[in-house]
């Protein structure tokens, strides 16, 4: 942290209340989407502050330290090959943390010798929805946790999804009473077996023996009809405003600020950030 050249006031009254030798602190987060909206709609929102592009870059670099995605290896099977990957959570909390609008997901694509995409799971649409994600297609559904992804409509999404008193999916903090799914990546040292109920892993991940203690080990089964050389690229992607959460918010047609926010969001291109990328080559 850079040192401050000037002195700092320590109290509102008294003598000798200024001190030197202090450092400048920068508070970082991960919501570059909101910062981008502030920058592009400063006049409309009445924002006078500057420096949003620089803040976006600082937060973007900070986010890249949150987790590592690795391709552990590949193996051939009849009419398919399998890619094994591992995510390591480098933060001291669940990832994503905090407000349940946030989600982290894996986007994995495979191309053949001609550069044509033969498989893609986790493809993101322009509106922020994820192809194949059950909760993005139907508000009442939840995309389950996977230890093995076998088709393009299965997406590995790390998220916390709440239920209301009737057991229905909700994105409202007022209505939410429990989790239907909480497979957010656990921090190192976290043990599912001894975790209290209020921080427990919920859903299929609770029974996934490869999901615990800050890591998740999983695989993708890629169907192939012939031999060849295949390129694999996998991205761990962070989305601060999940599509399903926003769709729940946008159902409110009474509060004018909701419609204003929807207009700004719909015209914002930046909707996700890449945390980590891994590549590999497989010869079938």
What residues fall within each predicted segment?
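Primarily the internal scaffold of c-type cytochrome electron-transfer domains
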Residues: 1-200, 208-211, 218-224, 232, ...
């Amino acid at each position: 942290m850079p040192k401050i050249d000037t002195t700092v006031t320590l109290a509102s009254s008294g003598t000798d209340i200024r001190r030197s030798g202090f450092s400048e602190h920068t508070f970082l987060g991960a919501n570059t989407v909101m910062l981008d909206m502030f920058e592009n709609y400063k006049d409309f929102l009445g924002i006078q502050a500057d420096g949003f592009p620089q803040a976006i870059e600082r937060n973007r670099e900070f986010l890249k330290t949150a987790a590592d995605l690795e391709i552990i290896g590949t193996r051939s099977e009849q009419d398919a090959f399998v890619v094994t990957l591992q995510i390591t959570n480098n933060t001291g909390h669940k990832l994503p943390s905090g407000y349940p609008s946030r989600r982290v997901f894996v986007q994995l694509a495979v191309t053949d010798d001609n550069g044509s995409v033969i498989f893609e799971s986790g493809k993101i649409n322009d509106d922020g929805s994820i192809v194949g994600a059950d909760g993005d297609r139907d508000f009442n559904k939840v995309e389950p946790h996977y230890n093995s992804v076998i088709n393009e409509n299965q997406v590995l999404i790390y998220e916390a999804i709440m239920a209301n008193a009737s057991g229905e999916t909700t994105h409202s903090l007022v209505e939410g009473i429990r989790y239907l799914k909480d497979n957010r990546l656990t921090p190192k040292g976290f043990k599912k077996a001894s975790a209290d109920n209020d921080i427990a892993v919920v859903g299929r991940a609770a029974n996934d023996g490869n999901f615990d203690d800050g890591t998740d080990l999983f695989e993708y089964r890629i169907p192939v009809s012939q031999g060849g050389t295949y390129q694999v690229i996998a991205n761990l992607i962070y989305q601060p405003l999940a599509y399903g959460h926003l769709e729940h918010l946008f159902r409110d047609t009474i509060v004018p600020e909701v419609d204003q926010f929807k207009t700004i969001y719909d015209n914002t291109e930046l909707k996700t950030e890449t945390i980590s990328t891994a590549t590999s080559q497989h010869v079938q």
